[in-house]
A protein has these predicted regions:
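A beta-strand signature from Gram-negative outer-membrane beta-barrel systems
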Residues: 95, 106, 153, 162-204, ...
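Extracytoplasmic gating/loop element in the C-terminal half of outer-membrane beta-barrel translocons
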Residues: 456-458, 466-476, 886-981, 985
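Residues embedded in well-ordered regular secondary structure
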Residues: 118-125, 134-159, 197-334, 372, ...
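Conserved small-residue
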Residues: 204-282, 747, 764-860, 900-901, ...
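Extracytoplasmic beta-strand/coil segments of soluble accessory domains associated
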Residues: 101-136, 140, 167, 177-197
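Outer-membrane beta-barrel transmembrane strand signature
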Residues: 265-311, 318-322, 390-426, 487-492, ...
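Extracellular/periplasmic, surface-exposed regions of secreted and cell-surface proteins
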Residues: 339, 345-356, 360-364, 399-450, ...
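Short, acidic Ser/Thr/Gly-rich low-complexity loop/linker segments typical of extracellular
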Residues: 52-63
């Protein structure tokens, strides 16, 4: 008994001494938080960096007090201010938070993950201030890793400047669909617009000047005029450019003009000396011409954007407003655009329980551009042998490209409006309810004008030769009289096409959130419930106005015969389309945390759509996601894991239900107008798709593992994601016996899988008061494979380069090629057939069996992408160098080989290596140029050259490394501005899309991606 009593007393002594030691190790930290102008800041979050349960906020006077361990570090954070970490002190602390507006850091973001759907394509979804904007197929997601990402995002969103964007977040895993539904299957780019923080009163002016360089032929696979004329002379010697052949084509170039001028007579002389010497002089001039169409059609101009913004904030209300204009005189000479925009982001808190918010975003733009002849396309498809001041034949009518740009153009007017209002009710720290409503409107009217002098209008009157009259489809010829002389249907004027597009979207979001902690903060629980609703209405259409005399007050002189020409040719002169998309979703989320280390998240979203009409069989689509997290940093043993400074991991699994490619849960009946060659008009109905009661939504199951860690006090930080996606019940062709008149209906018959790795790494190489060097590296790898497919694509589908093909056992968007053997002694291409035989023109493009002989060339989608950015700072100077890379994709080179060529065609550098004489087949794989005699001797020779275009030698890799951006910035020291009314002046000079460091030589100089102008951008930001 005595022993037990002694042990109890000893235990009490130990407990008391331990408690005393603990109390001795904690201190009461007190202080005050101010802004950069010395004003107190209320509601600043003050948190212990290690023990997050120790947390408080500043009062109305900016004061705080918190009991923490003696060696703790406190984190001070407030929206609109820079987050600050400060070691605790026993003395009263005075903390100053600087405005966060002055720094903009790029984020290391990987590209979007590949979706698992055979037929449906998903694109990144823009979400602005929590409201869905649209999917965007044109935005290059590789730009998200750029340090200049905000400027590129602003260029993609109407009415926003770079300064209007406060931050953006990229969501690529299954949580994207849990938040925004199946429309977010392609990933989400969530943009948050700027708003004023507390204690801010700032006026800012920003100007951005962009100088775009004129394109160069070094980036295009186009022969110069000397090499082009070498090909044309060989065609002439082979009998392919004779006058009787060239003059009656729909289009001609240098040879056609020479032959045409040789028979034109004026002022007692012919336009062209039709002698050998005269033709030689004419062709020699064309050979030396080397027209630079880029310089003819493009210009050196400066696009400038001006933005003024005003931000002000108090404890009760704050607002951010900006007004800006973008003036663009045009990269091409025919282009110009002016845009004006306004933004307002305001919040008001009249009571501690209630918060009201409103956002207004409006923009209006006017633009002028080329019409049927795009400047960049025309410059890259018009031969360099052509005289830019001369008229040539195009669709039986004369054409001068420079003059056509003046007579054939497009005018656009567009308006974009977004109104958003929100209300939040927070009666306690545990409960919060909010309601958000948004209305978005977009309207655009485009006028495509072809004046009476344009080539397009002159085609309606081209009938100066009998062969032209017989072949010109712009003339009217009665269907019941084969001997009738064609008639002009638009004898006067030109014509105009007016297109209009408008969309209206209404969104309503309701949320209720409950947050609580239990057992002294050991357990934390957050419950979220809500509903989303949107109503989207889209209207579009166009109509043609014929016989408009633009030079005499747009007088209308249409001919009634024109409507007969339209009707009998089964043509339309107007069309209208209306789309209604309605969706409602109910969602719930539960988050649980134990000791701030272990977490569980679960979410469920159930949404319905009107896409399937009255059918209820597949109206509702579920999406769910669960995740487990572990913050190893908070573990007691973590300090022993040196040099690790942070470590956390998360494992998630979820299923996303997505809309199928078709919506025929019930049969779909559509209207149509049967073609009648007479005046009878009899609308009809037809069965577009048979009913498929087994149709269900596509399912994507995703497993994702995330690992975040830091080394040596975050000098090195990394994030790693591994994911696996399984696509099931995918919609594709399901063959049947022709029941109901459909042999190839669509059904849930396919499946595929996708896997990937995403890595971002940031290293603080050098950190000092005067100099710092930071490196950010991003890498992503995405691969996929079709695991089940019922359809049987033929050869033409597999070798097509338009969108790639789906084939079981191979990646989606695959390209296959016909195996090339060698050239024959005549220079004709030869190929391997399915049975191993050598064929010239006997490859069956319609075959659906025995396809294993086709060579797998690769996929159109890159498998490996990323970027490398190095940022340097010395005093007030900053330098950034960004390199972008992409590997793993291929492309089919342009189909420019044929048994017949024309004098207006643009050819690539491959033709310099063409077969010219017997024996060349041993040194080159570029076929010869057939003569007219060879075409007569081998009637199927055209099939051989067509096959060559789809052979493996016409495949190039799209791997590239590009120096994307170099930027140099300078901030004028605040000490130098102390005696002025200015608070900050920031300058930045940037060069974008500089040059390729590496690309495949088979591209012959052409870019492996869509062309973007080389730009030099100067940005000046002045704050008051």
């Amino acid at each position: 008994m005595v022993t037990r009593l002694w042990n109890l007393i000893l235990g009490l002594i130990l407990v008391v001494s331990s408690a005393t030691a603990i109390c001795a190790q904690t201190i009461l930290v007190q202080g005050k938080v101010l802004d950069s102008r010395g004003a107190p800041l209320a509601k600043v979050s003050v948190t212990d960096k290690v023990d997050h349960s120790k947390h408080t906020t500043t009062d109305a006077e900016g004061k705080f007090s918190l009991q923490v361990a003696e060696q703790s570090t406190l984190i001070f954070s407030l929206t609109g201010k820079k987050t600050l970490e400060v070691a605790v002190s026993r003395d009263p602390m005075t903390i100053t938070l600087e405005d966060a507006e002055e720094t903009q850091k790029g984020a290391a973001v990987t590209t979007m993950r590949q979706t698992t759907s055979i037929q449906t394509k998903y694109y990144p979804l823009w979400v602005i201030d929590g409201v869905v904007y649209k999917q965007d197929k044109d935005f290059n997601t590789a730009d998200l890793a750029s340090p200049d990402a905000k400027r590129l995002i602003a260029a993609a969103l109407p009415g926003l400047s770079e300064r209007d964007i406060e931050s953006f977040t990229v969501i690529t895993d299954a949580s994207a669909t849990a938040l925004y539904g199946n429309q977010a299957t392609g990933g989400v780019i969530s943009v948050r617009t700027r708003h004023a923080g507390q204690g801010i009163n700032r006026f800012t002016y920003t100007t951005q000047l962009t100088y775009r360089l004129i394109p160069s032929y070094r980036e295009f696979n186009i022969l110069n005029s000397q090499d082009q004329m070498s090909v044309l002379k060989e065609l002439e010697q082979g009998g392919s450019l004779s006058p009787e052949t060239v003059l009656y084509q729909t289009r001609y170039g240098v040879y056609g003009l020479m032959y045409d001028n040789a028979i034109k007579y004026k002022n007692k002389q012919y336009y062209q000396d039709n002698t050998l010497e005269g033709q030689t002089r004419y062709l020699a001039a064309a050979e030396r011409r080397n027209t630079d169409w880029f310089k003819e059609l493009f210009q050196n101009s400066i696009r400038h954007q001006h933005t003024v913004s005003l931000a002000s904030g108090t404890q009760v209300s704050n607002f951010y407003a900006s007004l800006g204009a973008t003036i663009d005189p045009g990269w091409a000479k025919v282009q110009s655009e002016n845009t004006y925009f306004f933004n307002l982001n305001a919040s008001f808190k009249p009571h501690r329980y209630w918060t009201f918010g409103s956002i207004v975003n409006a923009s209006y733009s006017q633009s002028h551009d080329g019409g049927d002849f795009n400047s960049l396309t025309s410059a890259s498809t018009f031969s360099r042998t052509l005289d830019p001041n001369q008229y040539y034949l195009y669709e039986f009518a004369p054409l001068n490209l420079k003059e056509e740009m003046k007579q054939n153009y497009q005018d656009d007017d567009a308006i974009n409006l977004r109104l958003q209002a929100s209300i939040a009710y927070r009666p306690s720290q545990k409960f919060n309810a909010s309601l958000l409503g948004s209305i978005q409107y977009y309207g655009q009217i485009s006028e495509f004008i072809r004046t009476e002098k344009s080539n397009v209008s002159e085609r309606f009157r081209a009938m100066n030769k009998r062969l032209i009259r017989d072949r010109n489809s712009y003339l009217y010829k009665p269907a019941d009289d084969v001997y009738a002389v064609p008639k002009v249907v638009m004898p006067h004027g030109g014509y105009r096409t007016i297109q209009d597009f408008s969309s209206r979207r209404f969104d309503l979001q309701a949320r209720a959130t409950y947050t609580d902690t239990f057992a002294d903060g050991k357990h934390a629980l957050t419950l979220v419930g809500g509903m989303d609703l949107f109503d989207y209405l889209e209207k579009s259409g166009w109509h043609d106005e014929y016989g408009v005399n633009f030079e005499i007050g747009e007088l209308s002189t249409f001919d009634p015969l024109l409507f007969k020409w339209l009707h009998e040719g089964n043509r339309k002169y107007y069309t209208r389309k209306t789309t209604i998309d309605r969706n409602v979703a109910f969602l719930g989320n539960a988050s649980y945390s134990f000791l701030g280390r272990y977490s569980f998240d679960g979410s469920l979203r159930y949404e319905g759509t009107n896409r399937f009409g009255k059918s209820r069989l597949v109206r509702w689509i579920p999406t769910w996601n669960v995740a487990l997290g572990w913050d190893v940093t908070s573990e007691a043993f973590f300090p022993s894991l040196s040099p690790l400074s942070s470590l956390s991991t998360k494992l998630s699994y979820g299923m996303t239900g997505t809309l199928p490619f078709v919506y025929n849960s019930y049969q779909r009946i559509k209207p149509f107008l049967p073609f009648r060659p007479n005046d009878l008009i009899e609308p009809g109905l037809y069965l577009s798709e048979p009913a498929n009661h087994d149709l269900t939504y596509e399912k994507m199951y995703e497993l994702n593992w995330n690992l975040n860690f830091g080394l040596w006090d975050e000098r090195i930080s990394a994030s790693l994601n591994l994911f696996s996606r399984q696509g099931r019940d995918l919609v594709d062709v399901a063959y049947n016996q022709g029941t109901g008149g459909f042999f190839k209906p669509y059904g849930n018959v396919a499946s595929m899988e996708a896997k990937g790795v995403e890595l971002s790494l940031t290293t603080q190489n050098i950190q000092s008061k005067l100099f710092s060097w930071t490196t950010t590296f991003s890498y992503s790898r995405n691969t996929n494979k079709v695991t089940k497919l019922n359809s049987h694509p033929d050869v033409s589908t597999l070798v097509s380069s338009s969108g790639g093909a789906a084939r079981e056992g191979y990646p989606l968007a695959s390209i296959f090629s016909i195996p090339f053997y060698k050239l024959s002694k005549e220079g004709f291409p030869l190929f391997y057939n399915y049975d191993g035989s050598i064929e010239r023109d006997n490859i069956n493009f319609s075959a659906t069996e025995n396809l294993d002989y086709l060579k797998y060339s690769g996929t159109l989608q890159p498998t490996d992408q990323g970027g490398l950015n190095n940022s340097f700072r010395w005093k007030n100077f900053s330098l950034s160098v960004y390199v972008l890379y992409s590997f793993g994709s291929v492309k089919r080179l342009p189909t420019q080989f044929s048994s017949s060529y024309y004098d207006y065609q643009v050819l690539g550098h491959e033709f310099n290596r063409r077969w010219r004489a017997p024996g060349d087949e041993e040194r080159t794989n570029v076929p010869s140029i057939p003569t007219s005699g060879q075409r007569n001797s081998y009637p199927n020779l055209s099939r051989a050259y067509s096959t060559y275009n789809y052979s493996d030698v016409r495949i190039a890799r799209c791997d590239y490394i590009q120096l994307r951006d170099i930027s140099l910035g300078y901030s004028i020291p605040k000490a130098a501005l102390a005696k002025t009314f200015l608070s900050s002046v920031d300058l930045k000079l940037q060069a974008s899309n500089l040059f390729l460091i590496y690309s495949d030589k088979k591209l012959n100089g052409a870019l492996p991606y869509a062309y973007s102008p080389h730009s030099i951008i100067f940005t000046c930001t002045v704050g008051i």
